Curated annotation (Swiss-Prot):
Main location group: cytoplasm
Keyword set, alphabetical order: Amino-acid biosynthesis, Cytoplasm, Diaminopimelate biosynthesis, Lyase, Lysine biosynthesis, Schiff base
GO terms, biological process: diaminopimelate biosynthetic process; lysine biosynthetic process via diaminopimelate
Assembly information from the UniProt record: Homotetramer; dimer of dimers.
The species this protein was found in: Leuconostoc citreum (strain KM20)
Protein name: 4-hydroxy-tetrahydrodipicolinate synthase
InterPro entries linked to this entry: Aldolase_TIM, DapA, DapA-like, Schiff_base-form_aldolases_AS, Schiff_base-form_aldolases_CS
The EC number(s) this enzyme carries: 4.3.3.7
Coiled coil: none
Subcellular compartments: Cytoplasm
GO cellular component entries: cytosol
Presence of keyword Cytoplasm: yes
Residues annotated as binding pyruvate: 47, 206
Length: 291
């Protein structure tokens, strides 16, 4: 399923002045991403401001994207919450949408379950979904994270076939080595880890920076595929400071500000994330220019 799919973008959700989803702007962003090398999309993830989207908005957003993109675009719909019953419902409904390929489920945040609880949570989602499930391990936002042993256990489930891992390259390497399952794909969720994760056997990157640097990231994966390590290193060194700069302020505000510069979206987020103010935008521009 994930073979040769290296660059997946966690797509933003554009909003209009009425604080509604801006579908014409969304289509412009999708066109831009596909033209610059994105092979798949994560819908309504963290970058898509999932915490501020209603259940109805998430369904409508997923339905729109699934109907808009070419059928060979990999689509991963985010079903995850910190409520197992709600996550199961989301997974069932989202997995029924035509052209949705997989379901994303995040480590439960705030209520801080232990490993046994997280395994039960993900198992319930995978049991309910009509599409394969991608785990999302992000302890920096969830306050809890899956251990390698838990990932190995979950990878044995017939309907869990991937993970978005945001911890460390060492963690990624351990997951790849210990799952010993060629059908289980490990993606980094950290743009700056792209080269290192791939070297350790990672499938690719679920990216934020690809909104702005898709061509360069696509070229990086091309260089890696043909073993041109020198070119890959040059590209990663060029990209890493820019990737980090896009998180100098709460995401996705920096990416939205830069896409606004390209006349693709309004410079709008949903609270509690605020758009960059003038000083922040100036600082971001300087960071990106200096790097």
């Amino acid at each position: 399923m994930y073979e040769h799919i290296n660059l997946i973008t966690a797509i933003i959700t554009p909003f209009n002045a009425e604080n509604e989803i801006d579908y014409p702007a969304l289509d412009r962003v999708i066109d831009h991403l596909l033209e610059t090398g994105t092979q798949g999309l994560v819908i309504a993830g963290t970058t898509g401001e999932s915490p501020t989207l209603s259940h109805e908005e998430k369904l409508a957003l997923t339905q729109h994207i699934a109907a808009y993109v070419p059928v060979d675009t990999l689509l991963i719909a985010n079903a995850g919450t910190n409520n197992t019953v709600e996550s199961v419902r989301n997974a069932r409904e989202l997995s029924e949408i035509p052209n949705v390929d997989a379901i994303l489920a995040v480590t439960p945040y705030y209520n801080k379950p232990n490993q046994r609880g997280m395994i039960a949570h993900f198992t319930a989602i995978a049991d309910a979904s009509n599409r394969p499930v991608m785990l999302y391990n992000i302890p920096g936002r969830s306050a809890v994270g899956l251990t390698v042993d838990s990932v190995v256990t979950l990878a044995q489930h017939p309907n869990i076939n991937a993970i978005k891992e945001t911890t460390s390259v060492a963690f990624i390497a351990a997951e790849i080595e210990q799952t010993q399952n060629d059908d289980f794909a490990v993606y980094t969720g950290e743009d700056a880890q792209t080269l290192a994760a791939f070297v350790h056997g990672g499938a690719g990157t679920i990216s934020v920076a690809s909104h702005l640097y898709g061509r360069e990231m696509s070229a990086l994966f091309t260089a890696l595929a043909v073993g041109d390590w020198q070119e890959a290193g040059v590209l990663q060194r060029y990209l890493t400071p820019k990737m980090n700069a896009l998180f100098a302020f709460p995401s996705p505000a920096p990416v939205k500000a830069k896409l606004h510069d390209l006349d693709m979206v309004e410079n709008l987020t949903r609270q509690p994330i605020l758009p960059l103010n003038v000083a922040e935008k100036k600082a971001l521009d300087k960071l990106l220019e200096d790097m």
